[in-house]
Amino acid sequence: MSYPAEEEDVNYDPYSYPNDYDYHTGDPKADLAYERQYEHQQTYHVIPEVIKNFLQYFHKTISDLIDQKVYELQANRVSSESIEQKIYEIQDVYENSWNKLTDRFFKTSPWPEAEAIASLVGNDAVFLILYKELYYRHIYAKVSGGPTLDQRFESYYNYCNLFNYILNADGPAPLELPNQWLWDIIDEFIYQFQSFSQYRCKTAKKSEEEIEFLRNNPKIWNVHSVLNVLHSLVDKSNINRQLEVYTSGGDPESVAGEYGRHSLYKMLGYFSLVGLLRLHSLLGDYYQAIKVLENIELNKKSMYSRVPECQITTYYYVGFAYLMMRRYQDAIRVFANILLYIQRTRNMFQRTTYKYEMINKQNEQMHGLLAIALTMYPMRIDESIHTQLREKYGDKMLRMQKGDLQVFEELFSFACPKFLSPVVPNYENVHPNYHKEPFQQQLKVFAEEVQQQAQLSTIRSFLKLYTTMPVAKLAGFLDMSEQEFRIQLLVFKHKMKNLVWTSGISALDGEFQSASEVDFYIDKDMIHIADTKVARRYGDFFIRQIHKFEELNRTLKKMPLNTGASISSSSTSRAT
C-alpha cells in the first residue's frame, strides 16, 4: 500500500523538479498554447511531467502517513507530533497545490482518470479512492456540462468504497486527513445526492437507454443509503456521547471508545451530524433536522467547530429550520450571530476563491432570510448587521411590511435550500416540472403563513398610536367588520408568541415569549394597549464606537510615516 521512499525523495519538491519545464520554449505564446492543450483535452494520452511528479508526491505524503498511523495503532497510541506534521503536509497539498495545478491545467476539463495514473502510485487502492473523490468532485464543480450518468454512478460507488474502508475495517482505519478535507467529503457526498435526486426527475432530454438505466438501478444514490452512511459514521464515532460529556464539562476522550478517540472518526461523526441537519432540511423535516444536533450547543464556541464552512452551513440550516417552524426570534438570533461572524472573518476566506464564493452566496441568502424573519417578527438586532440589511434589502423590506406577497416569494426562492424528493419518480409519467414539486410545496406552506400575517403589520402600526380605543372604532379605521377585526387581534396574539430558546443544550428547547413592541388586552368592547418597547441604550453604542476609534488610532500609530519626498511625489502624481 505504501509508496517506497527512495533516498533522493526525502526532500522532494514537486515544483522544483527540472522536468517541469521540459516542454516550455521560452516563447510566451507557445508556452500558453502548451498549457491550454491540457486545459481543454478530455483524454490524456500524455500526462504532463509536472502532474506525474505532483501525484507521486501527493501519494507519498498519504502513504507515509498511513505507515506512521499503522505504527501508532500497533503501539496503541492515538496520535503523535509526527502524525500532526504529516496531516499538515497533506493539507498544504490539498488546499494549495491541487488548486494551483487545477487552475493551470484542468480549469474546465477533468483530471486524468484513476486508471491512467494508477501505475504512478503503485496501484495504491486507498490513494486511488481518495484521488477519485477529488476527481469526481472537480467534474461536478468545473467541467463543462457536468458529470455524465456513468460518472454519477461511478462517484457513488467510489464513496461506497471509501466509507466501507472506514466503517468496515476490523479496527480503526490507519488513515487521518485534514479536517477541511473530511468536511468536504461529507459536504460533497450530500451535494452529489441532492444533484442526482434532481437529475433523475428531469427526463425530458434523456434517451430511452438512460431512463431504462435509471429505472433498473433505483438503489444508486438512494436516500436510505445516504442516511445509513451518515448514521453509521455518527454511531461508529460515538460522537453524541462525546458531545454530551464535553458540554457538561467532562473529558470526551473518556467515552470516545475504540474508534471515536481517533480524529478521523470523531470529525467525520461530527460533520455527519451537520450533514443530517442539512439532509432533513432538504427533505422538509425541520424538527428532525434540529433534533440531530441536540448535543451540540450552538451558542458556545466548540473545539469541534474548526472548519468555517461547517460552522456557516450549520447556522444557515438551523436558522432556516427555525424560520419554517415559526420560531422567528431564534431564527433572527442564529442568522444575526453567524452574519456577524462572517463580517468579522471575511478576510480569512479571500485567499481561496472556491471557499469565498460559497461563503459569499450563503451570506447573501442569510441576509435575505433575516429580512423575511424581521419583517414577520420585528425586533432589535446588532446595529452593523441592521445597517447591512437596510443597504441590501431596505426597499424590499418596506414592500414586505405592506404585505407584498411577491417580494416574500422572490426572497424565499433565492434564499431557501434546493429541496428534493426522496422518492424515485415514476418514469412512465414524469411531467416537466416534477423536479420543482418539493420546492413548490415548501413555498406554498411559507406563502400560507405569510398570508395569515398579512394584516399584522398594519394593525401593529395602529396599536402604537393609542393607549385605549373602542374595538368597533379601530375596526372601522382598518375597513374591517368588528368580528373580523377580533379574529385578526387573536391572530396577532398567537403569531407574536414564539417558542424561544433560553438555556440548555438542545436547540429544540425553549419557552413561549413575545418580543412585540406592543401588547394589549380587550375588556368588553375596549382595547387597552401598552407600549413594551425598551428604550434604546445609547451608552452601549457610543462605548463600541469609542473602542473602534481607539483600535484605529493604535493601528495608525504603528504605521510608518511617509517621508516628505514621498508625500511630495504622491501629490505631484495625483495632480497630473
Swiss-Prot record:
Keywords: Cytoplasm, Initiation factor, Protein biosynthesis
TM helices/strands, residue ranges: none
Domain called PCI: residue spans: 330-536
Predominant cellular place of this UniProt entry's protein: cytoplasm
This protein's GO CC annotations: eukaryotic 43S preinitiation complex; eukaryotic 48S preinitiation complex; eukaryotic translation initiation factor 3 complex
GO BP term, pick one: translational initiation
Compartment(s) of residence: Cytoplasm
InterPro entries: eIF3l, PCI_dom, TPR-like_helical_dom_sf
GO molecular function, one term: translation initiation factor activity
Pfam families in the cross-refs: Paf67
Function as written in the Swiss-Prot or TrEMBL entry: Component of the eukaryotic translation initiation factor 3 (eIF-3) complex, which is involved in protein synthesis of a specialized repertoire of mRNAs and, together with other initiation factors, stimulates binding of mRNA and methionyl-tRNAi to the 40S ribosome. The eIF-3 complex specifically targets and initiates translation of a subset of mRNAs involved in cell proliferation.
HAMAP family tied to this protein: eIF3l
PANTHER family: EUKARYOTIC TRANSLATION INITIATION FACTOR 3, EUKARYOTIC TRANSLATION INITIATION FACTOR 3 SUBUNIT L
Subunit architecture: Component of the eukaryotic translation initiation factor 3 (eIF-3) complex, which is composed of 13 subunits: eif3a, eif3b, eif3c, eif3d, eif3e, eif3f, eif3g, eif3h, eif3i, eif3j, eif3k, eif3l and eif3m.
Family named by the database record: Belongs to the eIF-3 subunit L family.
Record-given protein name: Eukaryotic translation initiation factor 3 subunit L
